[in-house]
Amino acid sequence: MMQKQNMIVVNQKEIAKNIYELVLQGTLVQQMNEPGQFVHIKVAEGIAPLLRRPISICNVDQEKNEFTMLYRAEGQGTKTLATRKQGEMVDVLGPLGHGFPVEEAEAGQTALLVGGGIGVPPLYELSQRLVAKGVRVIHILGFQTKDVVFYEEKFAELGDTYVATVDGTHGTKGFVTDVIDNYGIDFDILYSCGPLAMLRALEGRYKEKKAYISLEERMGCGIGACFACVCHLQEDPSGHSYKKVCSDGPVFPIGEVVL
């Protein structure tokens, strides 16, 4: 159930170039039960920036009432958020959206989790939940260069983990699809989050597979009221049918929406 709460900053640190790990504490964490959901953050106490920032939920610890977000500080809003210090309060709205369907993966099956850039974080909580139910996980994490690689070791603790960098400075040179080809990776179910180009490449390969993708989209309200994040349905070539990424997604079955 969505709530709004002022949450306490437990810790914040830069873990890669311009990539920040922010841990917040509050009872709102008890509502975070679907990996792949996100929160809407008010990054400053004043009027500017006006709009909240959508950030995915990376890790949930309900015993401590803490959750972790990873985000890239690149615009005014996220750069402001990066200045928040331990003990300060952050206005959080969430959890929002529909997450990854963990129930679609069965014990004994192999799940392939593919993340690109800042689309990697929501896959971490998903991976933990899949492992807990007896699913074998394989991770492929794609980044531009070694300076922005993060959480490789954490994913490796859960299952086989491969990294691709576009410039070849770490792991496989190229894209996540190059890793799949190079290692002949097979799987029963696919979960992915990242840039559209990556999602399109995966959709082109795996239309017949059970697969789910999470879209990264700019949002206004985050609750389905402003229609700023709509995407069209593949089944309607007229373009008149659509779904909202914030409330109907951000996770969709592969082949449902136009990428």
Swiss-Prot record:
Belongs to the PyrK family. It comes from the Bacteria. This is Dihydroorotate dehydrogenase B (NAD(+)), electron transfer subunit. Residues 2-102 form the FAD-binding FR-type domain. Heterotetramer of 2 PyrK and 2 PyrD type B subunits. One of its GO terms (biological process) is 'de novo' UMP biosynthetic process. Responsible for channeling the electrons from the oxidation of dihydroorotate from the FMN redox center in the PyrD type B subunit to the ultimate electron acceptor NAD(+). InterPro entries: Cyt_c3_hydrogenase_gsu, Dihydroorotate_DH_ele_sf, Dihydroorotate_DH_Fe-S-bd, Dihydroorotate_DHASE_ETsu, FAD-bd_FR_type, FNR_nucleotide-bd, OxRdtase_FAD/NAD-bd, PyrK_electron_transfer. The gene is pyrK. Binds 1 [2Fe-2S] cluster per subunit. FAD binds at residues 53-56, 70-72, 77-78. Pathway: Pyrimidine metabolism; UMP biosynthesis via de novo pathway; orotate from (S)-dihydroorotate (NAD(+) route): step 1/1. Its cofactor is [2Fe-2S] cluster; FAD. GO terms for molecular function: 2 iron, 2 sulfur cluster binding; electron transfer activity; flavin adenine dinucleotide binding; metal ion binding; oxidoreductase activity. [2Fe-2S] cluster binds at residues 221, 226, 229, 246. Keywords: 2Fe-2S, Electron transport, FAD, Flavoprotein, Iron, Iron-sulfur, Metal-binding, Pyrimidine biosynthesis, Transport.
